[in-house]
């Protein structure tokens, strides 16, 4: 997994893959859009949004 731009449905799909059964806390206010869509984010950064 290399750092990627993830926006919209791609971002949600990536969170489902990374978090699995834990689920995730998704809110645009958390900065995930800025981190992963405007810039790039890593698998490790995505894991920060898992429950």
Swiss-Prot record:
Keywords: Carbohydrate metabolism, Disulfide bond, Glucose metabolism, Hormone, Secreted. Signal peptide: none annotated. GO terms for cellular component: extracellular space. Its main location: secreted. GO terms for biological process: cellular response to oxygen-containing compound; glucose homeostasis; glucose metabolic process; positive regulation of protein secretion. Disulfide bonds join 7-37, 19-50, 36-41. It is found in: Secreted. One of its GO terms (molecular function) is hormone activity. PROSITE patterns: INSULIN (PS00262). Belongs to the insulin family. Heterodimer of a B chain and an A chain linked by two disulfide bonds. Insulin decreases blood glucose concentration. It increases cell permeability to monosaccharides, amino acids and fatty acids. It accelerates glycolysis, the pentose phosphate cycle, and glycogen synthesis in liver. This is Insulin. It comes from Balaenoptera borealis (Sei whale).
């Amino acid at each position: 997994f290399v750092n990627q731009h993830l926006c919209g449905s791609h971002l949600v799909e990536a969170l489902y893959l990374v978090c699995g059964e834990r689920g995730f806390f998704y809110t645009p206010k958390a900065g995930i859009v800025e981190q992963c869509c405007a810039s790039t984010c890593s698998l490790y950064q995505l894991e920060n949004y898992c429950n």
